[in-house]
């Protein structure tokens, strides 16, 4: 069985499959992805594969420069996005935005 290239919390699976979530914000450990990469996607909780995505772009962002567009692409409010990022990556300020589409 092929390993997954990237994982998402299960709560995001339906939004990804429906095209409502089109970016992910990660820390430096996942900053190596580039436009054109096809990635196998699994659930964080059980590593179960659920789709393949294509990276369509990448950029950098800080917690302070997150904006409404990022929130819309994540399918959540800006306040919720900032809270989620701060919970997942405590004490970090520099992040990497990965734009993607389902294949």
UniProtKB/Swiss-Prot annotation:
Coiled coil start-end: none
Superkingdom assignment? Bacteria
User: What GO annotations for molecular function exist for this entry?
Assistant: hydrolase activity, acting on carbon-nitrogen (but not peptide) bonds, in linear amidines; N4-acetylcytidine amidohydrolase activity
Q: Provide the ASCH domain boundaries.
A: 6-94
Q: Name one GO cellular component term.
A: cytosol
Q: Spell out the catalytic residues.
A: 21, 24, 74
The chemistry this enzyme catalyses reads: N(4)-acetylcytidine + H2O = cytidine + acetate + H(+); N(4)-acetyl-2'-deoxycytidine + H2O = 2'-deoxycytidine + acetate + H(+); N(4)-acetylcytosine + H2O = cytosine + acetate + H(+)
- Report the EC code(s) recorded for this entry: 3.5.1.135
Q: Which InterPro entries match?
A: AC4CH, ASCH_domain, PUA-like_sf
Q: Where is the signal peptide?
A: none
Q: Which Pfam families match?
A: ASCH
Gene3D superfamilies, alphabetized: Hypothetical protein
For this UniProt record, the keywords arranged alphabetically read as follows: Hydrolase
General function of this protein: Catalyzes the hydrolysis of N(4)-acetylcytidine (ac4C).
Family as reported in the entry's similarity comment: Belongs to the N(4)-acetylcytidine amidohydrolase family.
The identity of this protein, by name, is N(4)-acetylcytidine amidohydrolase
Question: Which source organism does the UniProt entry give?
Answer: Salmonella typhi
Originating gene:
yqfB
């Amino acid at each position: 069985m092929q390993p997954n290239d990237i994982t998402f919390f299960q709560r995001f699976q339906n939004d990804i499959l429906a095209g409502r979530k089109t970016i992910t914000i990660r820390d430096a450990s996942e900053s190596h992805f580039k436009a054109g990469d096809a990635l196998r996607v699994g659930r964080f909780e059980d590593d179960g594969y659920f789709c393949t995505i294509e990276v369509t772009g990448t950029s950098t962002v800080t917690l302070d420069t997150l904006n409404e567009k990022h929130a819309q692409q994540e399918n959540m409010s800006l306040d919720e996005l900032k809270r989620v990022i701060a919970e997942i990556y405590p004490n970090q300020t520099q992040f990497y935005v990965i734009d993607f589409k389902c294949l």
